[in-house]
Amino acid sequence: MLIVDAYSKIPKFYGMENITTAEVMDKLDMFQSRFGKIDQLGCWGLERISTDAGTQFTSTEFKEECQTRRVHLTLAAPEHQEMNGQVEVTWRTLRTVAHALMVHAGVPEVYVHFALMYTTDHIFPVLPIKDLINEDGDPTTPNKLATGTKPSVSHLRVLFSPSVVKKATAHVETQTLNMRHQAQNDFRGIFVGIPQHQKGYLV
């Protein structure tokens, strides 16, 4: 599921085991816990949800949940996804950038997940967007508006670039061997992204 904040334009992909109302609400809570701002009453600043006419959004359960949270729900007409413009435009941009990364690296379609996640989490949020400005009227980025901090790009790497991983230890049956003094203590791989909840790189 792709969620896009209307104010900052910051996007976030969430995998879903089941396409249900409960699963959707759970992902919305996850998005708010990361990017939402708490007002003076201790409430999340979610006021409106604009989405397509999927059954998980048109269900009575979802509508009741929105009413309970005092969230205004707007549904796009069936077969008219252009009414859900913000998400559709963002999705096209993410898809275009992701495919460009794959074409540049010459990797097959099985890597599309890594390309989409890297684009969504690390490339799109740090790029200025047309007509996106801060309170002073200056151009800004989705990450800056969403978090209030200047985005860092020093940790970013070229996606799908060749990498060498240092192997400090090796596990043989029940033993852990120190590889520091061995002739070959590293191996080659491909950089495919950055972990979400820890430092380092995915290879």
Model-derived segments and their meaning:
Residues 1-96, 146-203:
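Retroviral integrase
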Residues 103-171, 198-203:
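Charged, gly/pro-enriched flexible loop segments at helix/strand junctions
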